[in-house]
Design a protein with these regions (language model features):
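Structural and coupling elements of P-loop NTPases
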Residues: 1-433
Length: 433
């Protein structure tokens, strides 16, 4: 496979939401359908027997929340998928903001009972600043939910973006039977025996709208309600425009339940069909765009994470490749340091787990061992013509605190520890001179 073919099969996106909308659970189910895991976990708090793959830190397992962004990669239907699972809680939003700089599109998860919430609005605004496509997954349809038409109106009024329902829910709560795919014009009815607490793939039955068999499968009432609602949608909604989606002006909307897997695979298939290949980035030195398929390698560092492996007390720099190909042991020019460095080892990331990679392509996110030479926003490149990507912006702190060491004899270690956490971007240090 040529470099261009490898690059064009990459899909790199972030998943954003307000806390507890089901973002990490959806991530797990995408991994399940992608074959990266055999049994999905979910975020349910301390009592959950199986924790989410992307929530690898002890505090995440204990509290049942995501506190740091995770990178996960799998292959599905010929596409190489890179998922950036981000924290939803505003306490950790700085990490989320930076991670969005590495994404080519975003999936916005919304709770069907609550609609658009505060943190969703903040993260949506960051996405719009980058003009990246935003796809919407309305989650928790297996619970009591607001009317689907009302949810669409809620998104458009609060976020100011047009919506287009790619599928339509059949019932909600205990009566959530499946979805109608507006592209194929097929009804996908989910089998209740496929639930198995959502840890396995769900079974689907496909049928034509209006098929008498749907009366038995859905109940006559839900079948007729679906026919009426689809007729209303087809008459009222504007035509689907992929160009508007790619410009971030129109959000395709999908309905489903991540917990029970209902609607997850149809979403994944349609999302990968519509979401863009790696986007061109702007060289801040010239103002020109850098073609992802060009031969010369370029990349930037968007995150630094220490102690992912407790046994080695390591420090990993997360690198988004913007063009060309990474090869193990290659040399690249470190723009901020003004010198060539050897990229001895790259690692493929699956949350906390890692594997050595010999090569990676534009769109991929890999980890580099960092002995202290990298900072967030650094650019790496090869070729005679140097490029530099814009630095990653800092955002206003969410909380303020005064920190003092208890043991004055350990001030050196205290200062070093604070500096390391600041270098990771987890905190901003304001000191009196």
């Amino acid at each position: 496979m040529t470099n261009r073919e490898e690059i064009e099969r990459r899909r790199t996106f972030a998943i954003i939401s307000h806390p507890d909308a089901g973002k990490t659970t959806l991530t797990e189910k995408l991994l399940l359908y992608g074959g990266a895991i055999n049994q999905a976990g979910s975020v349910k708090g301390k009592q959950s027997a199986k924790h989410a793959v992307s929530d690898w830190m002890d505090i995440e397992k204990q509290r049942g929340i995501s506190v740091t962004s995770s990178v996960l990669q799998f292959n599905y239907a010929g596409k190489c998928v890179n998922i950036l699972d981000t924290p939803g809680h505003q306490d950790f939003s700085e990490d989320t903001y930076r991670t969005l700089m590495a994404a080519d599109s975003a999936v916005m998860v919304i709770d069907a009972a609550k609609g658009v919430e505060a943190q969703t609005i903040k993260l949506f605004k960051v996405c719009t600043l980058r003009h990246i496509p935003i796809f919407t997954f309305i989650n928790k349809m297996d619970r009591e939910a607001r009317d689907p038409f009302e949810l669409m109106e809620n998104i458009e009024e609060i976020l100011g973006i047009k919506t287009y329902p790619m599928n339509w829910p059949i019932g909600c709560g205990k009566e959530f039977k499946g979805v109608f795919d507006r592209n194929t014009r097929k009804v996908l009815a989910f089998s209740s025996d496929g639930r198995a607490n959502g840890v396995k793939k769900v079974d689907e039955t496909e049928a034509e709208l209006g098929d008498p068999a749907l009366d038995e499968l859905l109940t006559p009432y839900l079948h007729q309600q679906l026919v009426d609602e689809i007729e209303l949608l087809d008459g009222a909604a504007e035509e689907f425009d992929l160009d508007k989606v790619l410009r971030g002006e129109l959000s395709p909307v999908f309905f489903g339940s991540a917990l029970t897997n209902f609607g997850v695979e149809p979403f994944l298939e349609n999302f990968l069909r519509l979401t863009p290949t790696p986007l061109a980035r702007v060289d801040s030195l010239t103002g020109e765009t850098v073609d992802p398929c060009r031969d010369e390698f370029s990349a930037f560092i968007f995150k630094i994470q220490a102690n992912m492996n407790k046994a080695h007390r390591d420090r990993i720099a997360f690198m988004r490749i913007c063009s060309g190909k990474f090869e193990r042991g290659m040399e690249a020019f470190h723009v901020q340091e003004g010198k060539n460095i050897k990229l001895a080892t790259g690692t493929q990331l699956m949350a906390q787990d890692r594997a050595i990679v010999d090569e990676a392509y534009a769109g991929d996110i890999i980890g580099l061992f960092d002995p202290g030479i990298f900072s967030i926003g650094d650019t790496l490149c090869t070729g005679k013509k140097k490029v530099e990507f814009a630095g990653i912006p800092t955002f206003s702190p969410e909380h303020f605190a005064r920190i003092e060491q208890k043991d004055t004899m350990k001030r050196k270690q205290f200062v070093k520890g604070m500096e390391q956490i600041a270098q990771e971007g987890a905190i901003q240090i304001l000191s009196l001179i």
